[in-house]
Amino acid sequence: METERALQQLELLQKKLYAYHCADSSLYLDAVTTAPSGTAEGRGVAMSILAGESQKLMTCPETKALLDELSARADELDLVHRREVEELRRSCEQLTRIPAEEYMAYKELCNRADDVWHKAKAQDDFALFCPVLQELVDYNRRFAGYYDASKAPYDALLNEYERGVDMEKLDRFFETLREGLVPLIRKIGEKPQIDDSFLHQEYPAAQQKAFADYLMEVMGLDRRHCGLGETEHPFTLEFNNKDVRITTNYDEHNVASSMYSVLHEGGHALYELGIRDDLQYTCLAGGVSMGVHESQSRFYENLIGRSRPFVEAIYPKMQAFFPQQLDGVSAEQFYRAVNKAQPSLIRIEADELTYCLHVMVRYEIEKQLIGGTLEARDVPAVWAKLYKEYLGVEVPNDREGCLQDSHWSGGSFGYFPSYALGSAYGAQMLRRMEQDVDVWGAAARGDLAPITGWLREKVHQYGGLMEPADVVKNACGDFSPEDYIQYLTRKYTELYGL
């Protein structure tokens, strides 16, 4: 087969896979936004069939022959096509090892589990969710062997979200964070606490929605290409670099919750919108890893969004949206309130300093679940034990405990460490960015274009063209958590007068 003809077939293959992705994503988006509560069963059948057809296309003899042919001609291919072939071969080999019936059943289970999780959380009923959680754990234990039988099961799953990461590396990473941050948290615990009571007045959802629209405008998110919806758990869903959807949740007694979830999900969206046009409709079109993705979301949410210059820039507008609630509250008071460091129950509402402790709880539980030393029925007790040990807080119920996140209901075991890695990647990127861009001058003007421009040049445009570690190295050098620890130490030492 001529190389040119083979590349045309490669393009068609990837567009077909993209079409399956769009169909599946559309069904999921409908499920969590507008679908009636009793519609999960039929949707699960459809999503299972789509998964089966996608797997069949990916593992058929014609696809394998095409990838073999192009691999043999690798020296004739440009970088983009070589990387496409490498990634598709990896997926092909993985999916070939998974029995088709098992793969389809798992996809149907994920749809059912998400529906059950929503009901269990609303009713604060872990017993309702427990059986499907155990099924998901059992599937993921088996799938880990299909992914890479040479690795420990949890290492194989971690590698699906952040290639090159394993438990040994994460144990060292989290221990470094513990050593650097826990003494700081204890010192702050001895200081007078910041008043954030004004954040918890009544903030009508309609006004919060209008403010969310304003924040998207400040971020430079083009509403022709980025939609904003409302769901129980905020998320980002990408179709291509001209069609990204984000969601948030409006708590009428916590205005900071939706504010920072919009900035967080907006960071994810900017990453997807910034990927090069020539990578669209290929396997390289999405973000390279969840760690790098979370570096972008948490960059805008925290490094920029909770900075004094940015808060001062947007605060007059915020007061205009909430004149009664913020009357007499200064920008400095607001800045201090949204940076208040205090151990809490809810991960997505945690402050920057204690956030990684929330991730560590989930990491320890996932290690045990996938390692076979913990069963689903025991998760609430272990969750409560670790929250008391790590954060010093009592877990009053499962809705605010182990049912608070949607990740496990979607089968995403191994995702959570990406949040902590992303936070550390982001701090390192900020240090490097400050050498090239007047970051704080731009933030003080409410002009994020120079910041986004730097990230687009160094990170976004490449999509999956490079390995995650190479993306980080290209942007800011070899990875180290020290910049993250120093950033938090400087910020909270000043904030609390340590």
Model-derived segments and spans:
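A well-structured
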Residues: 1-163, 464-467, 482, 489-498
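C-terminal, non-catalytic "cap/extension" segments appended to globular domains
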Residues: 2-6, 22-25, 38, 42, ...
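Divalent metal-coordination and catalytic microenvironments
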Residues: 10, 148, 264, 297, ...
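Secondary-structure capping and boundary motifs in well-ordered enzyme cores
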Residues: 42, 102-105, 132, 204, ...
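Post-HExxH zinc-binding segment in Zn-dependent metallohydrolases
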Residues: 286-327
